[in-house]
């Protein structure tokens, strides 16, 4: 049964993740409505889909987090190889001062996320806004707190939005931003 669910999630997210990555690589700031809405539903139902989008933003390189890696994480988030990959990527992004962001790629993703949130309502807005908050915080953008607050207005229990808001308030930042 578990493999059937993982396969169904892979099949469902393959085209939306592929468009997402293609748009990041090509600096296209808006997704098709169908795929945008599918990602909003996926993020609302599976936080691993949200985490895959975050990975694609903070990695800064399509060779690190391609569509296959995103599908692996979203469909099998507890697989040890996926846990290790996510941990290593996030650890490097936070703690390696030489791990600089691909600013244009990240801004492109934030723009797509904002557009996604505008296409849906209620609980389906929360995670796109939260990922936009996270990406904005990671870049050092003043928009981070606004995105986090918008997400929290919709769901006051959204843990990641609360973490982003707290990080902004405490002036916490990734290592690369400490160098600047």
Task: Give the positions of each predicted feature.
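Charged, compositionally biased boundary regions
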Residues: 1-180
């Amino acid at each position: 049964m578990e493999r059937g669910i993982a396969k169904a999630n892979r099949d469902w997210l393959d085209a939306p993740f592929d468009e997402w990555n293609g748009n990041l690589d090509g600096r296209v700031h808006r997704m098709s409505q169908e795929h945008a809405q599918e990602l909003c539903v996926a993020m609302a139902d599976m936080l691993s889909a949200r985490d895959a989008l975050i990975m694609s933003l903070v990695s800064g390189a399509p060779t690190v987090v391609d569509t296959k890696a995103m599908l692996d994480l979203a469909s099998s988030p507890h697989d040890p190889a996926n846990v290790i990959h996510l941990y290593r990527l996030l650890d490097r992004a936070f703690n390696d001062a030489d791990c600089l962001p691909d600013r244009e790629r990240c801004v492109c993703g934030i723009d797509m996320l904002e557009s996604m949130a505008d296409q849906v309502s209620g609980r389906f807005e929360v995670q796109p806004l939260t990922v936009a908050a996270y990406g904005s915080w990671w870049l050092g953008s003043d928009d981070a707190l606004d995105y986090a607050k918008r997400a929290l207005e919709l769901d006051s229990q959204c843990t990641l939005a609360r973490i982003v808001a707290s990080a902004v308030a405490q002036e916490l930042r990734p290592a690369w931003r400490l160098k600047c």
